[in-house]
Each structure stands twice: as C-alpha cells, then as structure tokens.
C-alpha cells in the first residue's frame, strides 16, 4: 500500500474516531457551551450586525479571551463565521435568534434543569420505570411543573415552540372541511382551533383542557367561534364531529390511552372522527426525533411513541379502527372512527 494511502486511511480513522468521541462522549460539553450562547442572546446580538469578540465580551461582561474561545468553538459547527476576529451568524444559526422559532426549545434542552432531569436516566432504563421526576424529588412529572415556577415557565415556553413548529404542517396538510365542530383535546392556548376557524368560516372550535391550564393560559386565542371548556379527558369531553389529540396519547401508557379513547367514544356522534397527531415509528426508517421523543416520554411519564403495529393493537382493544394515515403532517396523523 502506498504511503499516501496509509496516511489517508490513518487520517480518516482519526477523524471518524474523534467524531464519535465528540458526538457521543462529549456532547454534554457542547450543549453546556451552547447554553451560554442562548442565555446571553448572542445570536440576536450578532444578528443586528457582525461584532468583534472584544465588543461581545464587553456587552456580556466576559473575559475577552474566554469569549473568543466560546465563539470560535462553534465556527466548525456552522453557527458563526469569523473574519479578522469579527463574528457573524450564518443562515443556519438565524433560527437561534429569539424570533427564529426554536430559541426556547434550545435554551430549555441545554439548561441545568434539563440536565438535572436526565441525571436519573440510567436508572430509568435499568429499572424500566420513569425515574425522571425523582431527580427533582417527585414521582409525577407534573408535580415538578406545579411546584417549580422557573421550570414551569421554561417548560411551557419550550412546549409552545414545539407546538408552533408542527401546527403549520397540520393545518396545511389536513382536511377539516367536513366538520362543523372540532374539539382540541388538551388544547391549552387554542392555537390549533384558532388556525382552523380562520381557514374554515363555518367551523366552530372548542379548546378542552384542565381548568388550571385554561385559566393560566396567557396567550389564549380569542374568537367568537372558539369556546374554552375545562375538564378531564378521563371523565368527559364535549360532543363534536372531530376530536384532535396532538401529542396527547404519547404521554400515556396503553391502559390510560384506552381510558381516554373510551371517554371520547361516549361523546361522539355517529360519524365523528378522532384525529391523532403523534409519532409513528417506522422500524425500516427510524427518525431521530421519534426516538428522542420515545426516550423522553418514557423517562418522564413511563409512556412511549408507537409503531403502526402498536397503534393497530391499541385500536383493536378499543371501539375504534384506523381509517387512514397521513405521513405528511408533523407529527403524523391517524384518523380513527368507531368500528
């Protein structure tokens, strides 16, 4: 083998090895450094105009060289460009400014609270139970939200952005034109029905959620064709032509999901439909997001994301059958009707 070939092979091995080490062994370091950028709104700062690292250091009250080290760390990741010690953001990192759509997601996922929440994940897998809440001293995830105002605020902001990313694909790629009344089960601030009543002039929307959620939602969508109803989907839901459950059932195990579906079944009209927007894990085409969410809901709630076979088995145990599937929406859509 030629010397140049040996050198090339050696270099490739070096790069592949360190890519693995830095991605899987040191990802926590990148996340914590990234959190410094998010907490100091550095992407917004540089988005206004490229800045010398010394100017940035002065604004955020950092040591100049420490600031330079932090900024240059993310140049190979494509988040900054550097020219004569002046840093600018890239098309990629424009999504990380506060109005970019994922600012709160990135800030929460790289936060100390989130790291703390995952400190017990080895035990969750070892014991096959959700020990995420135990990292905060609780058995139930929602007790963290109820008692920790900082966590509650960050979590709600993150969830709002998570929802905002998916809603446009849902509205664009789902036909609600045949329905008079749509209930968004667990609908929180009413964003989905808010978009639906704008698109369909004859449609009425009901946002159904817990009383505490309805009363505390500061961004509640107001419209003459939108009604807010409080209650528990384990007890009763309003009567409607269509029930939307977006990222609801993945928070619950099969037994609880069957209870939710049974409750809805009691209020359904003859031709009512259930629109379930949730991940459908494809064993032949795994998606990073689906599997990230699967691990997350397991660690938080002892629940799961489901494959198509899992969804079919769930329906077999209930009053419902799957009429159709839409893989274009994010998350995917399963349309259910009574058997």
From Swiss-Prot:
> Is Methyltransferase there in the keyword field?
yes
Family per record: Belongs to the class I-like SAM-binding methyltransferase superfamily. Cation-independent O-methyltransferase family. COMT subfamily.
Which cysteines link up through disulfide bonds?
none
State the EC number(s).
2.1.1.-
Q: Does the keyword Membrane apply?
A: no
**Which keywords has UniProt assigned to this entry?**
Methyltransferase, S-adenosyl-L-methionine, Transferase
Query: What top-level class of enzyme does the UniProt entry assign?
Result: transferase
Query: Tell me, what is one Gene Ontology molecular-function annotation carried by this entry?
Result: S-adenosylmethionine-dependent methyltransferase activity
Catalysed reactions listed for this entry: (3,5-dichloro-2,4,6-trihydroxyphenyl)hexan-1-one + S-adenosyl-L-methionine = 1-(3,5-dichloro-2,6-dihydroxy-4-methoxyphenyl)hexan-1-one + S-adenosyl-L-homocysteine + H(+)
An individual GO BP term: biosynthetic process
Q: What is this protein called?
A: O-methyltransferase 7
Residues the record marks as active site: 250
Task: Provide the binding site for S-adenosyl-L-methionine.
Answer: 186, 209, 232-233, 246
Pfam family, any one: Methyltransf_2
